């Protein structure tokens, strides 16, 4: 960044770990915002639902303390105050998304184990969706011996699941067998299972929704978003730093 310093403006545990890891990469850090800052690193994601920074305060106040040519790094940076700034959005980087998906999957398994009254070995599990997180969940759960079924829309995806040793079901027909599962993990960001449909589940079925938009309806559903920063902040912080260093080197 033209010899200027990086200012870490995050307020989460992941951001604190990121600050520690940045020193391992010999990144020149600024202790406070000022004219010597070439880039600012926000939390990932960077904003709360009300548009304020997750660290607290407004992004406008933060930017007022920084040079007009500062580079803003973070996640979900589609904020109107940033329209005239150069932004590096980690959540649009494919490598970051892939590595973050694995951390998310591991966090989800940790949550599931804290609620299940049984081990994952031979536990009937349904994973809904065959995206990045769904694939990572499949690998982990299969390795732990779960009786795994993946719900996917595409014939090719279901064929891949069967080739990997998982059972597969068309998403449109998964409701027919809901009663057999003791753990359901949704990764699809759309409403797929209603409260009435979920009433068919086993009384002790653990239902965890990982999607950005809720896919399962009902009070019994555990809505789990932003897991890496909450459950594994060190791994999340390290990934943020590795992504920052990599993207800067690619410029």
Locate the predicted segments by residue.
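Glycine-rich adenosine-cofactor-binding loop
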Residues: 6-22, 121-142
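NAD(P)-binding Rossmann-fold cofactor-contacting core
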Residues: 24-31, 144-164
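Residues in the short beta-alpha loop(s) of Rossmann-like NAD(P)-binding domains
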Residues: 12, 76-78, 153-155, 211-213
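N-terminal ligand-binding/catalytic initiation module
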Residues: 1-82, 87, 243-251
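Rossmann-like adenosine-cofactor binding region
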Residues: 45-54, 58-69, 162-232
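Adenosine-phosphate binding glycine-rich loop
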Residues: 86-122, 216-251
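Active-site regions of enzymes building and remodeling cell-envelope glycoconjugates
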Residues: 23-27, 37-39, 70-71, 82-95, ...
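Conserved mixed alpha/beta catalytic, RNA-binding, or beta-rich assembly cores of soluble enzyme
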Residues: 43, 55, 89-93, 102-104, ...
């Amino acid at each position: 960044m033209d010899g200027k310093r990086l200012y870490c403006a995050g307020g989460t545990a992941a951001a604190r770990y990121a600050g520690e890891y940045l020193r391992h990469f010999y990144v020149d850090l600024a202790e406070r915002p000022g004219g010597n800052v070439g880039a600012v690193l926000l939390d990932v994601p960077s904003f709360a639902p009300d548009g304020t920074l997750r660290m607290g305060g407004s992004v406008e106040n933060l930017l007022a303390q920084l040079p007009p040519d500062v580079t803003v790094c973070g996640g979900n940076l589609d904020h109107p105050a940033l329209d005239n700034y150069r932004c590096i959005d980690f959540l649009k980087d494919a490598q970051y998304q892939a590595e973050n998906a694995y951390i998310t999957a591991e966090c989800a398994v940790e949550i599931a184990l804290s609620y299940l009254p049984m081990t994952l070995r031979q536990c009937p599990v349904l994973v809904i969706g065959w995206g990045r997180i769904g694939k990572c969940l499949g690998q982990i759960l299969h390795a732990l011996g779960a009786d795994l079924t993946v719900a996917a829309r595409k014939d090719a995806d279901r064929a891949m699941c069967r080739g990997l040793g998982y059972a597969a079901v068309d998403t449109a027909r998964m409701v027919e067998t809901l009663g057999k599962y003791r753990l359901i993990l949704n990764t699809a960001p759309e409403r797929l299972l209603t409260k009435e449909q979920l009433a068919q589940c086993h009384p002790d079925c653990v239902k965890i929704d990982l999607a950005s938009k809720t896919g399962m309806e009902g009070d019994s559903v555990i809505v789990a978003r932003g897991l890496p920063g909450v459950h594994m902040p060190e791994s999340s912080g390290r990934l943020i730093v590795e992504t920052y260093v990599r993207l800067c080197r690619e410029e």
